[in-house]
């Protein structure tokens, strides 16, 4: 598969969020977020089911894979802000940072385990069976959300402005009213703009610069995910720390120092590069987890869908620009 095709498929993974995010945020705030999450998971499951059936009879055409990636991205664009918006309705305010830390730890476990499990399954099962597992996961997620009682916003949703465009603009207006959160959004955008190109080069650095093999790439990725796991657990354990802006500052500093050291390493410095990757992973929860918790605490629940969709959209736009 050519690099242009790989890039196209990567763009399909997050461009829908970047383009449609602000409009999706309005829908998330207008309607029952529980139903939105269930619907998003079922859409992802349906798209995966189509691939499963087609893969059973023929080799999957690239255009179909790209369409399914687009549909999955739309589903994620609904699910992610809805999930972030309902979290403060379920978790006490003083526990939001801890919750974000543990959530990032679970995510990092999937980064560590998924490649190994995927390689094992691919060696013993057909592709359609592997895709079916993904479909099953989406169905299980829908059932899980269905049985969880999520408080509704009630009258606050009904009081939303009927003007769709004005509601979209309210997301930015709410952010601009809180100068600290707006500054944090700008920092996050710059963070994505700088880090994403470097992250995309990690496999190339491992293979070409350090004269490595695919095993070296795996070691680097596992190191990053392991650091992220430890960072998430630490944030979960000590999430009540009050000076959270200090945590974000320390996270950016750790990331910057690690990237600088990585850029100065000789070709014999792969081990140090692995250590730097672990430190980078360690720093991530103290930025993204704390940022999410701050938004959840400072923004009223009826605006959270629009705010999280808007921030996700802006950061998603920063990714291709940085690349």
UniProtKB/Swiss-Prot annotation:
Q: How does the record classify its membrane topology?
A: Multi-pass membrane protein
Q: Quote one Gene Ontology molecular function term.
A: transmembrane transporter activity
Sorted keywords for this record are: Antibiotic resistance, Cell membrane, Membrane, Transmembrane, Transmembrane helix, Transport
Any GO CC annotation of this UniProt entry: plasma membrane
Q: Which domain of life is it from?
A: Bacteria
GO biological process: one example: response to antibiotic
Q: Where is it mainly found?
A: membrane
Tell me where in or outside the cell this protein is found.
Cell membrane
What Pfam families is this protein classified in?
MFS_1 (PF07690)
Q: List all membrane-crossing ranges.
A: 6-26, 51-71, 105-125, 128-148, 182-202, 219-239, 245-265, 270-290, 303-323
- Please report which protein family the annotation says this sequence is part of: Belongs to the major facilitator superfamily. Drug:H(+) antiporter-3 (DHA3) (TC 2.A.1.21) family.
Question: What functional role does this protein have?
Answer: Confers resistance to 14-membered macrolides including erythromycin and to 15-membered macrolides but not to 16-membered macrolides, lincosamides or analogs of streptogramin B. May function as an efflux pump to regulate intracellular macrolide levels.
PANTHER family on file: MACROLIDE-EFFLUX PROTEIN (PTHR43266), MAJOR FACILITATOR SUPERFAMILY (MFS) PROFILE DOMAIN-CONTAINING PROTEIN (PTHR43266:SF2)
Can you name this protein? Macrolide efflux protein A
Could you tell me the gene encoding this protein? mefA
